[in-house]
Amino acid sequence: SYSEYRAANFEFAPASASINLKGGDYSAENGSGAERLEAYNGKSRVLKWDSERGSVTYDFSLPEDGLYNITLTYIQLICHGNSIRLSLKIDGAYPFKDAEDITLPRLWTNKGGIRTDDKGDQISPEQTELLEYTAQSLKDSDGVAVLPFEFALRAGHHTVTLEMKEEAFILAEIKLCPPEKTEDYRTVSAGYSEFDRYSGDPVIIQGED
């Protein structure tokens, strides 16, 4: 499990630098039907992957041992309307069980305004897919671990392999970056002294306009 993986790599400290890999700069592919595109929607050297199968592999080198988040910058393609599902290998192996099934969310936006039914009740707007790039750090699909996965990697040469399970997307970038530092409560609460305590009337937000 991921918790066991992190416990086994407790000696690793957060990395100090990031590595960026272009989606189209993969070193190998296996039955993916993936296509390199010189440009798509403002991003260069991207990967178009719409076969729902196969794998692509990227080579990279790290200057130091450290913990890294892995963030994918992608844009969903119209397919079945489900979340994008893939798996990830480091140096040819799954680093932990949870890496075998990773979910990337689709983006949605309102299609039109709030509707009103024949009883006068307001209904949420219909949803339509928002086809623009988003950056998502890989994390537990079940929400057991809230923070993004932290991958423990030694300095030197490595490979990262993505295996597609479901849906289609344009992959613009893979970024290995230091985990974002989370301040402890004592540090955060110390900054609250700058704010005045609210003393006005309660603020009520209606469920309908």
Q: Which residue ranges define each predicted feature?
A:
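Extracytoplasmic
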Residues: 1-209
